[in-house]
């Protein structure tokens, strides 16, 4: 367990793997924590210096008031890399984490060696959905949306066969401060990188669960089409968080991708 006070923000992070290995930054999704990348972090730590962290307002990282933007959250990622003395890193992100990763590839391409964009899109809308979700959370609390969110994160078969994992992620959601979730959701609501995808110049792998209804395979196809040279892998029998639901398949796709760089 490690914490850093970076530009006034307490950030919880973890570094695994040899210090001399290529850095790999893992960015988690809205409402989760760096633990959603735990299987990949462990598997890849032999060949990478794996850096995981909790986004502001998530996990054990400090929350801040007000709406967040992708630029703000991408800045947090760069500040952490600066704190750790990392000039350039491979970057992988899921959902909101994937939007942050896209932002880094577009606005700080010199800092990014490659991108893995999991179950994400250049824009996740419509905006009214996020406003309605925020209103529901403020009215009835985080617990009122847990079942609906879990049904998007995981397939019914996984929830039935691995209830302990699904319930653990549900507990994580329930405990998250409502305003911290809403602040981060504003970054998703307002983000749209569709017109700038062509500026991503690094090798890119797009991953998507075949049963993802939040950012479906069609959105992944659009990312692949918009990013020069991008590759696409569809993870079978997975919804929005394949890193948890199908960890071996995600790790295998990432290992194959990195081997080809």
Stretch-by-stretch model annotation:
Residues 9-63:
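Conserved HGGG/HGGXW glycine-rich cap/lid loop of the alpha/beta-hydrolase fold
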Residues 11, 125-128, 140-199:
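Conserved alpha/beta-hydrolase catalytic His-Asp/Glu region
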Residues 54, 90, 113-116:
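Residue in the alpha/beta-hydrolase core beta-strand immediately N-terminal to the catalytic nucleophile
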Residues 71-89:
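Conserved acidic catalytic loop of the alpha/beta-hydrolase fold
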Residues 99-146, 153:
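Flexible "cap/lid" loop of the alpha/beta hydrolase fold
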Residues 200, 206-208:
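Short beta-strand/loop motif that positions the catalytic acidic residue
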Residues 210-215:
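Acidic catalytic loop of the alpha/beta-hydrolase fold
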Residues 230-261:
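Catalytic active-site module of serine/aspartate enzymes centered on a nucleophile-bearing elbow/loop
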